[in-house]
């Protein structure tokens, strides 16, 4: 039974939106129970002399009354409420905070920009794959945080006075989406960035992740339009031109962009273009968490796992009682196959990791039923929370599991956008063969297999006499060869 002492809540009083996250701890990570988000646009109520309007404060209090109902079930020491840029700036913030504390029944802490940046980084470190040097970018309503670090440790923290709400009011107040508006917004953002750019470059990064609504909106747009999930400057410029073609903010229509995100999308886009340009960022992906996750993990005192994906796989294997010996057996065989074809197929390390992840989860569908197990596996993986994996990577894993046996659904492999379609096909072929040859569930019964690739042709060589001594195995291999031939994957068995 779930009791209130196992619940934790984090509330972020942002400049654009107020968010509440309620979680419980499960095996070293968090399980989300409630997420509530309301567009309050607090920053829009900030005057030139930093007075917060009565209307903006009332919008905020109204939202907090909703949050307060949920907080009644949670012990006060397990609740953290923080306020960010707008309430740092507002000269009458005390009035808002006093009433907010009365409504919520717990303290509200106005955190510094540097503390906000640190918490954002911790949220990313706990939920996003990869332990290498990273740059984290979070575009808020009134401030933008940029952080460099490795693993759990930050190396530089910056909070800059620019955000999607304040830039909307300054550079798109006429609601015109003209080239001139974008030029002015980008120039202003680059001016703000320039003093810290050298320090960020000095610390360096190998990967860049975005943790804001703007980046989330971009991810949704790219997935809706069938693009791969990497955000690049070319894609940002393409979206800017589309916005300019729409002419006015109220007429902004881009496939995948929700009405809720549309208002501050152009201003956030302009800031992001400036960041890409000024810091020469090659590409960015979406983070798995940010400020609220940082608050929660901080309350739980959980250390950052250096391999978040492995932790996720272990947790899911325990939860669904997956046979880990068999999962490792299939993964070992798939890794062996990869090694044999890597020169011909040039499969990148990230694709290799995704294939091995699919191997670890391939029997998850059996927890529902043997009948249609691949469909159950795909459904579960598509809808489970998988810290460390991006939405596109989850979709690829689900697609591989859907196609782990039986006739291949080629269109599904082409509809994912984590890797090119050809790579998805190659990963699928190797997964299917590894599952087939590990089917006896004993290491000593896995034959020595040589696999050669020439373009899309695979030649599979078995030990002399193996096919003659394994009639069921021969039947399964012949069936697999036939299924692969249906989608023009030549498989020669020797």
Curated annotation (Swiss-Prot):
Gene Ontology terms: biological process: guanosine pentaphosphate catabolic process; guanosine tetraphosphate biosynthetic process; nucleobase-containing small molecule interconversion
Keyword Hydrolase recorded: yes
Keywords for this protein: Hydrolase
Pathway: Purine metabolism; ppGpp biosynthesis; ppGpp from GTP: step 2/2
Pfam families referenced in this protein's UniProt entry, alphabetically: Ppx-GppA, Ppx-GppA_III
The reaction(s) this protein catalyses: guanosine 3'-diphosphate 5'-triphosphate + H2O = guanosine 3',5'-bis(diphosphate) + phosphate + H(+)
Keyword Hydrolase: yes
Disulfide bonds: none
Gene3D superfamilies for the chain: 3.30.420.40, Exopolyphosphatase. Domain 2, Hypothetical protein af1432
Matching CDD domains: ASKHA_NBD_EcGppA-like
MF terms in GO: guanosine-5'-triphosphate,3'-diphosphate diphosphatase activity
Stored SUPFAM superfamilies: Actin-like ATPase domain, HD-domain/PDEase-like
Enzyme Commission code(s) on record: 3.6.1.40
UniProt xrefs under InterPro entries: ATPase_NBD, GppA/Ppx_hydrolase, Guo-5TP_3DP_PyrP, Ppx_GppA_C, Ppx_GppA_N, PyroPPase_GppA_Ppx
PANTHER family per the UniProt record, alphabetical: EXOPOLYPHOSPHATASE, RETROGRADE REGULATION PROTEIN 2
Family membership noted in the UniProt record: Belongs to the GppA/Ppx family. GppA subfamily.
Role played: Catalyzes the conversion of pppGpp to ppGpp. Guanosine pentaphosphate (pppGpp) is a cytoplasmic signaling molecule which together with ppGpp controls the 'stringent response', an adaptive process that allows bacteria to respond to amino acid starvation, resulting in the coordinated regulation of numerous cellular activities.
NCBIfam families: PRK11031.1
Name of this chain's protein: Guanosine-5'-triphosphate,3'-diphosphate pyrophosphatase
Organism: Salmonella arizonae (strain ATCC BAA-731 / CDC346-86 / RSK2980)
Gene transcribed to yield this protein: gppA
């Amino acid at each position: 039974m779930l009791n209130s002492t196992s619940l934790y809540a984090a509330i972020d009083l942002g400049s654009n939106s107020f968010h509440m996250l309620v979680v419980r701890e499960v095996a070293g990570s968090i399980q989300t129970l409630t997420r509530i988000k309301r567009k309050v646009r607090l920053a829009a109520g900030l005057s030139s002399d930093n007075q917060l309007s009565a209307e903006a404060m009332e919008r905020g209090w109204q939202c907090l009354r909703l949050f307060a109902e949920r907080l009644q079930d949670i012990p006060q020491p397990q609740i953290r409420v923080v306020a960010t840029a707008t309430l740092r700036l507002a000269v009458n913030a005390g009035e808002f905070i006093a009433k907010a504390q009365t409504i919520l029944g717990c303290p509200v802490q106005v955190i510094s920009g540097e503390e906000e940046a640190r918490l954002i980084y911790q949220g990313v470190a706990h939920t996003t794959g990869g332990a290498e040097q990273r740059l984290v970018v979070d575009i808020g309503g009134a401030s933008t945080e940029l952080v460099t670090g490795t693993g759990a440790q930050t190396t530089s923290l910056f909070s800059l006075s620019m955000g999607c709400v304040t830039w909307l009011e300054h550079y798109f107040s006429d609601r015109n989406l003209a080239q001139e508006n974008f030029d002015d917004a980008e120039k202003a953002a680059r001016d703000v960035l320039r003093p810290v750019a050298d320090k960020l470059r000095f610390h360096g990064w190998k990967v860049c992740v975005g943790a804001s609504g703007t980046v989330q909106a971009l991810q949704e747009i790219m997935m809706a339009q069938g693009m791969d999930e990497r955000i690049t400057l070319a894609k940002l410029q393409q979206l800017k031109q589309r916005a300019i073609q729409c002419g006015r903010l109220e007429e902004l229509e881009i496939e995948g962009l929700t009405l809720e995100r549309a208002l501050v999308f152009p201003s956030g886009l302009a800031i992001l273009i400036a960041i890409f340009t000024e810091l020469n960022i090659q590409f960015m992906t979406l983070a798995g968490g940010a400020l609220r996750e940082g608050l929660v993990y901080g309350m739980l005192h959980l250390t950052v796992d250096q391999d978040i994906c492995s932790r996720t796989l272990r947790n899911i294997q325990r939860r669904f009682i997956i046979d880990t010996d068999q999962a490792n057996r299939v993964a070992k065989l798939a890794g062996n196959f990869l090694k044999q074809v890597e020169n011909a197929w040039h499969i990148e390390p990230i694709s290799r990791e995704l294939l091995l992840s699919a191997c670890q989860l391939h029997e998850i569908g059996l927890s529902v039923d043997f009948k249609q197990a691949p469909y159950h596996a795909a459904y579960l993986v598509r809808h489970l929370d998988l810290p460390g994996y991006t939405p596109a990577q989850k979709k690829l894993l689900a697609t591989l599991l859907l196609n782990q046996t039986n006739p291949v659904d080629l269109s599904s492999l082409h509809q994912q956008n984590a890797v090119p379609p050809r790579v998805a096909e190659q990963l699928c072929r190797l997964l299917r063969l590894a599952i087939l040859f590990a089917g006896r569930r004993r290491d000593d019964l896995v034959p020595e297999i040589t696999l050669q690739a020439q373009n899309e042709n695979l030649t599979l060589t078995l030990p002399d006499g193996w096919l003659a001594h394994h009639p069921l195995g021969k039947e399964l291999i012949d069936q697999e060869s036939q299924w692969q031939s249906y989608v023009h994957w030549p498989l020669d068995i020797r």
